[in-house]
Design a protein with these regions (language model features):
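PAS/PAS-like sensory domain cap-loop motif
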Residues: 37-49, 111-112
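PAS-family sensory domains and close relatives that share small-molecule sensor folds
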Residues: 93-95, 104-110, 121
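PAS-family sensory domains
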Residues: 114-124
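Sensory modules in modular signal-transduction proteins
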Residues: 4-33, 37-39, 83, 144-146
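Charged alpha-helical signal-transmission linkers that cap and connect PAS-family sensory domains
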Residues: 109-112, 129-130
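PAS-associated C-terminal cap
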Residues: 1-8, 123-137, 142-146
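PAS/LOV-family and closely related PAS-like sensory domains
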Residues: 46, 58-101
Length: 146
């Protein structure tokens, strides 16, 4: 790449165009960035998601546990999932369908090293999880037939 390569422009284009969901939420859990991948996976257009709580993609039965972890991360500045570790969890689409997503998070700090938000990169793995469940069920059925 030539000397006229603009890293900031590249990063912006990459974040917007990535096929995976890229979501940034501020310290209160309000969505501030939502890319085309997030729209494809979750169904909400950018204008529908920006300014909303992350609750729009978190199944209701998991919200208390999620927010406890989120608030702990905001308080301490540390997360168990910020070192490239991938977490698989259920998520919610706009139409109410539950999907399976894998994600990793990137904590964001200000100049004073205070947490200001978290970015997450998410991938829909619903099809893979369904195939794994079907294979496991087939294996159980095969073993029971023996």
């Amino acid at each position: 790449m030539g000397s006229d390569f603009d890293v900031d422009q590249f990063c912006g284009l990459l974040a917007h165009a990535a096929p995976d969901a890229v979501i940034y939420a501020d310290h209160e859990g309000m969505i501030r960035f939502w890319n085309a991948g997030a729209q494809r996976i979750f169904g909400f257009r950018e204008a529908e998601a920006i300014g909303k709580s992350l609750d729009i993609i978190i199944p209701e039965n998991l919200r208390a546990r999620y927010w406890a972890g989120f608030n702990e991360t905001m308080r301490t500045g540390k997360t168990r999932y910020g070192n490239g570790d991938i977490l698989a969890v259920p998520a919610l689409r706009q139409d109410g369908a539950r999907i399976s997503v894998e994600f990793t998070v990137l904590p964001f700090h200000d100049e004073a090293r205070q947490m200001v938000g978290i970015a997450a990169i998410l991938r829909d793995v619903t099809k893979r999880f369904e195939e794994m469940r079907a294979r496991a069920a087939n294996s159980r059925n095969f073993a029971a037939a023996d």
